[in-house]
Amino acid sequence: MFEKLSQAACSEPFAFLGPFIDPTQGALRVWMPGATGVALVLEGQPRIALEREKESAFILKADLNLHLTHYQLAIDWNGIEQLVDDPYQYHGIYAEYDDLHTPKTMYQHMGSQFMTLERDGKSISGIRFLVYAPHATAVSLVGSFNDWDGRRHPMQRLDYGIWGLFIPGLTEGVSYKFEMKGPKGEGLPHKADPWGFYAEQYPSFASVTYDHARYQWQDAQWQTRPVTEKRKEALSFYELHAGSWKRNEQGEFLNYRELAAELVPYLVDMGYTHVELMPVSEHPFYGSWGYQPVGLFAPTSRYGSPDDFKFFVDACHQAGIGVVLDWVPAHFPSDDHGLANFDGTPLFHDPDPRRGWHQDWNSFIYDLGREQVRRFLVSNALYWFEQFHIDGIRVDAVASMLYLDYSRSHGQWIPNMDGGNENYDAIATLKWMNEEVYKYFPNAMTIAEESTAFPGVSAPTFMGGLGFGFKWNMGWMHDSLSYIKEEPVHRKYHHNTLTFPLVYAHSENYVLSLSHDEVVYGKGSIHNKMPGDEWQQTANLRAYFGYMYGQPGKKLNFMGAEIGQTAEWNHDDQLQWFLLDFPRHQGVQALTRDLNHLYRNEAALHDQDCIPAGFEWRLQDAAEQSIIAHERISEAGERILVVSNFTPVPRDEFRLGVPNKGRYQLLLNTDDSKYAGSGYEVVVDVKSEAVVSEDLAQSIVLRLPPLSTLFYKLA
């Protein structure tokens, strides 16, 4: 046993260290590498020196029964004394089976947890560490409290593949990792805590102890608001990368609190309902934008502490802004300190690269056929809702999870048990995650980034769906951008590209997304996808945004689009805020603000987004003129007419059939001079006439500005 202890290879330290159960064998054994002496300290009694048994072992052979007695150790480090509680007197370090295997409670027990244990009538505070490493032959806790010496604190092998140890007296802010021996006794890289709540940056990547109970939330009014049906709400998401929205004068990141001070009033002014953060789970490589996470339970410390991130969410909620996080359960990177070969085996991924390795992203794929991996991920999703009060998660790369042959050629994948390409384990996991989230957090929302036609992504699980609340409409994004990139003179040949998305617009609960994916890897900015000179580019962009807000579906824009950013997004720099010195870009920002407020204020533009009753075509086939028109209809029967002219040719007397007799009043014109438009005179109030047009008995005559979208409300 001494040899195992000296090699940090002991799996049952409680059988050898601490108080002896049989006092005839002695009273106490202590293993303290590097110490020159150890003494027993009992309250109100003289100290008793322990004898050196081996080089690092000390033993007390007195006839004392310390099995139920609280004691301390006075350790002599070459003349410097340290008084500590002996961790190996605390046997009550475990938790109930259900607590360790139920997603809702796992994060309250695994990893590092502050707790108080009773011993000999005393309340002893400290931190209990639990880690799942079933194939390890030994696990030690190493950290700043023991000079990263794996011999000092061997952990006890418990049941169900879990190792544990309670360290009395530890406080917040202590760095730690796990030192393990693999199945054959081989040494492994030090591992960060998979359940760690806080982490350091390069070079240590160590986990850090953190107490969730300390932060005092101020968002009770938000948290207790009535449960609503999100499909009927106006949802406008501002997708944001925390490191590159704004920088300080030195070009450094804003921390979470500084970001809150700048961002929250901006979101309120601009009319957004939610901020959607690109992944904040700890990730070692900044250039991954968070999509290669290692610490799933830790908000990245690049921008501050977990308390600082809570402050950010708190500030958003107090201002009426919801917070959605990007969540990455599809894959994880191969960094040595992370989940890869965690206990010397492919614990979190399939050993067969045809199922366990993502060749596009050079990352491991979670093995969702393993119950403990599924629980780990579902627990992580619930954790962010409970501990950080988030309002939703946007699940990244769902298609890569659903299909075993995703981005793979013949021979590079393994079929399921029925010979197909569906990943049954991933499907079951996503369903379970959604059920758990909505069960415990009924006001939450889950959103899928799913790029295929997999059926029922946003259908309830009891109807055979995956159970997401919403799905990004990747088809709309692709088709609409493909259309708007065409020169106006050519758009008539691509008219069907613009109208086709309405064929399936209500097959899912859709979010119309113009995400970060569209402004990277040489794709350019949304602004620069527009054809023509500078004025036409901006006019096209305004018309396109108007068209987007008039279409059925919730809205998402990546940061920078709202100011007409001209450069492709660069995560190493802030947005081009200087563009707001120019009227054209001021106009795009002002339009985005007005579109958000219009969308939120007019029920017809949002409360039937997800059902066919909320949309009617008024003009679908005017390809030669590149004009479309439709009406949006609220549950209460309110109607808003949306007309888009995608050519630079103004239409002086454009007759359009309408189904209802009445007056149509202008709500918004994307070509208005206040948006730096042409200022072409439009009709602000028009009464329908009994003139047949488009097979409708009533019609109105409008003036359509060049490259514009108009909104009229039926009075």
Curated annotation (Swiss-Prot):
UniProt-listed Pfam families: Alpha-amylase (PF00128), Alpha-amylase_C (PF02806), CBM_48 (PF02922), GlgB_N (PF22019)
Active site, renumbered: D396 (nucleophile), E449 (proton donor)
GO cellular component, one term: cytosol
Segments traversing the membrane: none
Pathway: Glycan biosynthesis; glycogen biosynthesis
Catalytic reaction annotation: Transfers a segment of a (1->4)-alpha-D-glucan chain to a primary hydroxy group in a similar glucan chain
Signal peptide per UniProt: none
Disulfide bonds: none
Subunit structure: Monomer.
Family from the record: Belongs to the glycosyl hydrolase 13 family. GlgB subfamily.
Name assigned to this protein: 1,4-alpha-glucan branching enzyme GlgB
Organism: Vibrio vulnificus (strain YJ016)
Upper classification of the organism: Bacteria, Pseudomonadati, Pseudomonadota, Gammaproteobacteria, Vibrionales
